Amino acid sequence: MSDNHTEHSLSLTLTPTISEQPALPSTYLDSDIHCPILKQRLDAFQRWQAEAFNSGTSAEVLIAARSDYIDHLLQRLWTFYGFDKVPETALVAVGGYGRGELHPLSDIDVLVLSKQRLNDEQAQRVGQLITLLWDLKLEVGHSVRTLEECLLEGLADLTIATNMIESRLICGDVALFLQMQKHIFSDSFWPSPQFFHAKVVEQQERHKRYHGTSYNLEPDIKSSPGGLRDIHTLLWVARRHFGATSLSEMVDFGFLTNAERNELNESQSFLWRIRFALHLVLTRYDNRLLFDRQLSVAQLLRYEGEGNEPVEHMMKDFYRMTRRVSELNNMLLQLFDEAILALDANEKPRPLDEEFQLRGDLIDLRDENLFVRQPEAIMRMFYLMVRNQDIKGIYSTTVRRLRHARRHLKAPLCHIPEARKLFMAILRHPGAVSRALLPMHRHSVLWAYMPQWGSIVGQMQFDLFHAYTVDEHTIRVLLKIESFADEDTRPRHPLCVELYPRLPQPELLLLAALFHDIAKGRGGDHSILGAHDAVEFAEQHGLNSRESQLVAWLVRCHLLMSVTAQRRDIQDPAVIQQFSAEVQSETRLRYLVSLTVADICATNENLWNSWKQSLLRELYFATEKQLRRGMQNSPDLRERVRHHRLQALALLRMDNIDEEALHRIWSRCRADYFLRHSPNQLAWHARHLLEHDSTKPLVLVSRQATRGGTEIFIWSPDRPSLFAAVVGELDRRNLSVHDAQIFTNRDGMAMDTFIVLEPDGSPLAQDRHPIISHALQQAINRSDYQHPPRVRRLSPKLRHFSVPTEANFLPTHNERRTYLELIALDQPGLLARVGKIFADLGLSLHSARITTIGERVEDLFVLADKDRRALSLETRRELAQRLADTLNPNDKL
């Protein structure tokens, strides 16, 4: 059921007329064998291939045609350079070329094989032949070895051994080639068990490089999990162990069913088609579907739709196909393991109950037809897996039965009452995600259970923010939530580990995570649509109204805490009150912060840092305090100012400071300054201001990380260009600003605080402190900072995205402030450009919250005009226009 889907590109029937294939090189005269003529004819052949592909000729036909063309070219050159007269030599295709698979930019790997070492004159002729091929711009990899050298080097190197196993004679001494074949398929050359084990380890290491999933948004068609290499691995093992040279021969040996062979052939054909198209788009060899190539490839494959729809359709097909390859690869390698290694051949299975048994640590069916007769037994198997920690996976023949039953389901599993009870029992059990939901996803049982899941399987998110498809991201959210029950997670997520045991029903959090992105790709607000699905699902599964509404609220508001913490002024009591009013209870707050942290971490490994952690902690505790105080009771801001001052004073008295001088400094500061700084920060500022020459600006760089970044404090005469000067200089030093608090005292002195990070997201390196401090001093001292923001080109990735600039003025009751939400394409020097616009318009900035989400920036600025009042409608219009004119990407960037 869950594997039935349409590959958009494969449904096309195109039959336009194409030109005839150019003549093969075997017909070339000796006078034709020089570079310009050969290059002209090779180019004609390559143009014919592109034309044929565009006209609907299959990739299989064209790949074989290219291999055949190169065979004829090499045979002709072998004769031209006189090797047909050299005894006991052969030209052998190895690797992908040995399999007869050449894409437009594929490497052409050849072996010049000889009985005895070639003499100098013969070696020189080989060099001339290879040089000619290079001059034709063919990517040729070659080796020149005697038979003995081949065997010795093959024994020492798995890659060389694998290439030799795939070898194919192009021309030359047949007996010599067969002699090599006899040796490499003997028991002394990489015995089958040793070769199998080495290839499994090699595949595991390769998968690790891609985080164990093909669902990265820029996958490698060849090497990602579920890609062509996973099919090659099956063929290599079968070739070495059985001598099978094709998937059909694997059926003859009883290790593939006809259906599995057809599925692998279909998968290989699809992956070949995408790879062939990619090679036509590129000029240099690569197999990665990078963002800037995806649209061109999708269009070449005739995917249709508006905007990024062709890419989304193509990538959805790709991800679904690689899922099938991965499942078959794992199942068949397990079957090979039993056949080749036979480690557990004599071990009797241990009964688990009347339906299942344990083979080693793998669960196995006792009745091979059980899943077809009783589909709910599929859920009974996963319930056993979550309850029994001895079970580490599913036995290969049971996977085969599961795949068969899955395809013959007449309705979703959730329509069966017993299956629903089992599903909820799984969710309520510790380890539900890793031991049940994850394997259910890997084997498409989640899709078979709940139809909504099928719509997000392979659903990509065309941005730089999300690293995975929607289904893979959701599974990672679930795994992250499960990790909060583990004490080992405490150092990285102390708050969530502390709160998790206090969640009355953790299964409701898992349900919310399962549905939080379920409506992505449907159009409309995915949070609202997903909440509707969640309520229906919860009620269908017997949850009461309170439980159903909690799950729906978490789905509807799963972005609320992240948006509030990162894009709102959480030191504003009104923001905390508004957020608290939505949350309503401490219990809902605990659920929400757990879902929020898991969602951020599972979106992109590089997204979570101590800066985001500090913001969420601050919002959590401020909201908790507000909820305990009661929604009707606003915080006493005067009391908080007094409290901060007294605590800072107590710290300063330990240094025997001049209190009279301190009070002169503090008397010039406004209440906001004391509200928005901790007592430690107030004491740090005062300590240095008391010792500082008041005729010069002061720049302080904190030695301790603040909110995961480095705090920079600036005291200087205020002027409109000050912010632009500071952020411009920080940008020139490759520092990113994440937060800015801007204060102007009653005497016109600015007291500004910036939180900055290095490009890798870490606090400012200690050895850079004096350099940055000195650079900022110089920038501030210039009477009118005119250093233009750096103009740098957008990276190729960023250039591929379109984020129109939006200037949204948020509603507020504050008549003295304007809240500007700026959304724009992330680009070098953005904040410096924005600061210059503020300065040009004579605006004063009071705070800034900087948020980068993939290719987008979503920043919050609190502004006032020169009279310290909110911006007029006319000023807001001018500001919005200036921002759009300056920040919308163009060719100059």
UniProtKB/Swiss-Prot annotation:
UniProt GO MF annotations: [protein-PII] uridylyltransferase activity; phosphoric diester hydrolase activity
Region (Uridylyl-removing): 352-710
Organism of this sequence: Yersinia pestis
EC number: 2.7.7.59, 3.1.4.-
Needed co-factor(s): Mg(2+)
Sequence ranges assigned to domain ACT in this UniProt record: 711-793, 819-893
Note on domains (UniProt): Has four distinct domains: an N-terminal nucleotidyltransferase (NT) domain responsible for UTase activity, a central HD domain that encodes UR activity, and two C-terminal ACT domains that seem to have a role in glutamine sensing.
Protein's name in the database: Bifunctional uridylyltransferase/uridylyl-removing enzyme
GO biological process, one term: regulation of nitrogen utilization
Activity regulation comment: Uridylyltransferase (UTase) activity is inhibited by glutamine, while glutamine activates uridylyl-removing (UR) activity.
CDD domains cross-referenced by the UniProt entry: ACT_ACR-UUR-like_2, ACT_UUR-like_1, HDc, NT_GlnE_GlnD_like
PANTHER family with a match to the protein in the record: BIFUNCTIONAL URIDYLYLTRANSFERASE/URIDYLYL-REMOVING ENZYME (PTHR47320), BIFUNCTIONAL URIDYLYLTRANSFERASE_URIDYLYL-REMOVING ENZYME (PTHR47320:SF1)
Function of the molecule: Modifies, by uridylylation and deuridylylation, the PII regulatory proteins (GlnB and homologs), in response to the nitrogen status of the cell that GlnD senses through the glutamine level. Under low glutamine levels, catalyzes the conversion of the PII proteins and UTP to PII-UMP and PPi, while under higher glutamine levels, GlnD hydrolyzes PII-UMP to PII and UMP (deuridylylation). Thus, controls uridylylation state and activity of the PII proteins, and plays an important role in the regulation of nitrogen assimilation and metabolism.
Region (Uridylyltransferase): 1-351
The HD domain, residue ranges: 470-592
Keyword Hydrolase attached: yes
Family: Belongs to the GlnD family.
Catalyzed reactions: [protein-PII]-L-tyrosine + UTP = [protein-PII]-uridylyl-L-tyrosine + diphosphate; [protein-PII]-uridylyl-L-tyrosine + H2O = [protein-PII]-L-tyrosine + UMP + H(+)
